[in-house]
From Swiss-Prot:
SUPFAM superfamilies listed in its UniProt record: FMT C-terminal domain-like
Catalytic activity: L-methionyl-tRNA(fMet) + (6R)-10-formyltetrahydrofolate = N-formyl-L-methionyl-tRNA(fMet) + (6S)-5,6,7,8-tetrahydrofolate + H(+)
Protein name: Methionyl-tRNA formyltransferase
Organism listed in the record: Rickettsia australis
InterPro entries according to UniProt: Formyl_trans_C, Formyl_trans_C_sf, Formyl_transferase-like_C_sf, Met-tRNA-FMT_C
């Protein structure tokens, strides 16, 4: 999970990509909500914002704009 705009968002489905990168862990590195990890990249596929229904990443991003280079915690 991560926090964004004071909301807790659960990652329900994701794929781990074992690839090298130079980003800080937690950085959003694409418009498709790919997140840099300590090593590798997490490609988010399904999420759920607190008190909301679960959505695939495309549906979620239509209603919530998380900009590239945002650092999630």
């Amino acid at each position: 999970y991560f926090s964004y705009n004071d909301k807790v968002i659960k990652i329900l489905e994701a794929e781990y990509l074992n690839t090298n990168h130079h980003f800080t862990a937690g950085t959003v590195i694409s418009d498709k909500l790919e997140i840099a990890c300590g090593s590798g990249i997490l490609q988010v596929q399904k999420l759920q914002q607190e008190s909301k229904k679960a959505l695939n990443v495309e549906e979620f991003l239509r209603g919530t704009n998380i900009l590239k280079a945002t650092i999630l915690k």
